[in-house]
UniProtKB/Swiss-Prot annotation:
Function: Alpha-L-arabinofuranosidase involved in the degradation of arabinoxylan, a major component of plant hemicellulose. Acts only on small linear 1,5-alpha-linked L-arabinofuranosyl oligosaccharides.
GO CC annotation terms, alphabetical: extracellular region
Domain of life: Eukaryota
InterPro entries listed in its UniProt record: Alpha-L-AF_C (IPR010720), Glyco_hydro_b (IPR013780), Glycoside_hydrolase_SF (IPR017853)
Keyword Acetylation part of the UniProt annotation: no
Broad class of the protein's primary localization: secreted
Protein name: Probable alpha-L-arabinofuranosidase C
Catalytic activity: Hydrolysis of terminal non-reducing alpha-L-arabinofuranoside residues in alpha-L-arabinosides
Entries under PANTHER family matching the protein: ALPHA-L-ARABINOFURANOSIDASE C, ALPHA-L-ARABINOFURANOSIDASE C-RELATED
Family the UniProt entry places it in: Belongs to the glycosyl hydrolase 51 family.
């Protein structure tokens, strides 16, 4: 949690860090990823059989090696919009017997050469946990139950035996399952009303938890601020002893929200993720309101928020139907850093956050047949995943603010937009880690820092301009490591992310 005092442009900014004031434990799942059958995310991204850079499974070794440095705890699969017409059974068994199907989300052909077993094997090689989305478009409850049985079944039953026949004796124990994806959207096959979705989601959840009570089920929300979010929460967050429930455990464990931000202008781009902060706050209140109105007892586990699609994405410059391959700038990297600061500040309410997507599609990591490129947005992800874990701690920022245009415009009425964006963490190793984004395009900001002690390790991400990119054959944006003695004010460079690290 970071509190804020607004200063004039003439005042000296300050940051006060309080390591003894722990706010909440950070769920490492806020550094989760997402892989969809879209563009080159799967085919030519994580899976490229026949390429000299791939292993015996067809998995790109350079991609795996890079992703391992991010220590990604969970990866969502296989969609996304793709999920509304995907049938998992098409993607298991002998590859020469798998049918190719028309793909209606991105208007292509799905070969099904990469499916459930391949993805779960890839997760094991990467060292991450899978998160599956169920087909709420053309899919059925029987199909969903069969998929869970295939992945998790231990008995002498048809789909558990089919898994064994396909070469996997032990269950995969897939824990996270989403009840559809963006079913409210007009772009979806089988778009639903909030009334129809809520009824269907609750009934599916009952059946799924009867089959496997250990599942973590994620309700499909909108952006956290919509009537859809309130209605679905109100009708699905019921007491365990409700007459509508047949489960001894809560049916809904998380509520999903999605948001993408972007602007062609730097400052609206860099401040746009503050919309996500307000969305998290509103969603958290809606969860509490639904529980209060439905008489859910306080001892029943409270659902957390699953922000399972987020990123900087301009769908005009990176069209989804054309693969959504963004060329990210330093401005975008700073926006991603603000996104991550938001997640650290709001860790109390977050159970997961999945950047969309992991490879090639609006991604920090791009592939060619010959290798990989780490985009500008890679570096904030790397620093946060490595250092911003443990406990969110109290911090106070005093700073002047940016007073110009915001995107979306409503940010201006509900959030302050300081020149410095800050979050602070106390790691399990006893180190304080403070992430500071200076969004100012022209000015370094000299800041007093109360709480720093001893030698401070400094990691800085910046470039010559906010338009700097790593996609022109050279790395214009990277991490530079240095030290600071912790004495006097610290000057945060213009248009930069700085991570300060010292022993508490």
């Amino acid at each position: 949690m970071t509190t804020f005092t607004k200063l004039s442009d003439q005042d000296t900014p300050s940051i006060a860090i309080h390591p003894s004031r722990r706010i909440s434990k950070i769920n490492p799942n806020i550094y989760a990823g997402f892989t969809e059958h879209m563009g080159r995310c799967i085919y030519g991204g994580i899976y490229d059989p026949g390429n000299p850079l791939s292993d015996e499974n067809g998995f790109r070794k350079d991609v795996l090696e890079a992703l391992k440095t991010l220590d990604i705890p969970v990866v969502r699969y296989p969609g996304g919009n793709f999920m509304a017409t995907y049938h998992w059974i098409d993607g298991v068994g002998p590859k020469d017997q798998r049918p190719a199907r028309p793909e209606l989300a991105w208007l292509g052909t799905e070969t099904n050469q990469f499916g459930t077993d391949e993805f779960l094997k890839w997760c094991e090689v990467l060292g991450t946990e899978p998160y599956f989305c169920l087909n709420f478009g053309t899919g059925t409850l029987d199909e969903a139950l069969a998929w869970v049985e295939y992945c998790n079944g231990t008995g002498n039953t048809y789909y558990a035996n089919l898994r064994r026949k396909n070469g996997r004796e032990e269950p995969y124990n897939v824990k996270y399952w989403a009840l559809g994806n963006e079913t409210w959207g007009p772009w979806q096959v089988e778009q639903m009303t909030k009334e129809a979705y809520s009824h269907k989601a609750y009934q599916w959840a009952k059946a799924l938890k009867l089959l496997d009570p250990s599942l973590v089920l994620i309700l499909c929300g909108q952006d956290g601020t919509a009537s859809w979010d309130y209605y679905t929460l109100k009708h699905c967050l019921l007491p365990v002893n409700s007459p509508l429930s047949t489960s001894a455990v809560p049916l809904i464990d998380m509520h999903s929200i999605h948001l993408y931000t972007s602007s062609s202008s730097h400052l609206p781009n860099a401040t746009a993720p503050l919309a996500a902060e307000r969305a998290i706050e509103i969603t958290s209140s809606l969860i509490d309101l639904a529980r209060i109105e439905n008489g859910v007892p306080p001892e029943q586990a409270r659902p957390t928020i699953c922000f399972d699609e987020w990123n900087v994405w301009d769908p005009i410059r990176a069209e989804g139907s054309k693969g959504a391959e963004e060329c990210y700038t330093l401005s975008d990297a700073l926006a991603v850093a603000v996104w991550l600061n938001v997640f650290v500040r709001k860790s109390k309410d977050l159970g997961m956050a999945c950047i969309a997507q992991t490879v090639n599609v609006i991604s920090p990591l791009m592939t060619t047949k010959e290798g990989i490129t780490k985009q500008t947005t890679w570096w904030p992800l790397y620093l946060f995943s490595k250092y911003m874990r443990g406990w969110t701690i109290s911090a106070h920022l005093a700073s002047a603010t940016y007073e110009g245009e915001t995107s979306p415009k409503w940010i201006r009425g509900v959030k302050e937009t300081p020149w410095l964006d800050v979050s602070a963490v106390l790691g399990e190793d006893g180190y304080v880690n403070v992430a500071v984004v200076n969004i100012h395009e022209e000015k370094a900001i000299e800041t007093t820092i109360d709480g720093a002690s001893g030698e401070v390790t400094v990691f800085t991400v910046t470039g010559d301009s906010v338009a700097a990119t790593n996609m022109k054959g050279k790395e214009e944006v990277a991490v530079v490591e240095s030290t600071w003695d912790g004495q006097g004010p610290y000057a945060f460079p213009k248009h930069s992310l700085t991570l300060l690290r010292w022993k508490a």
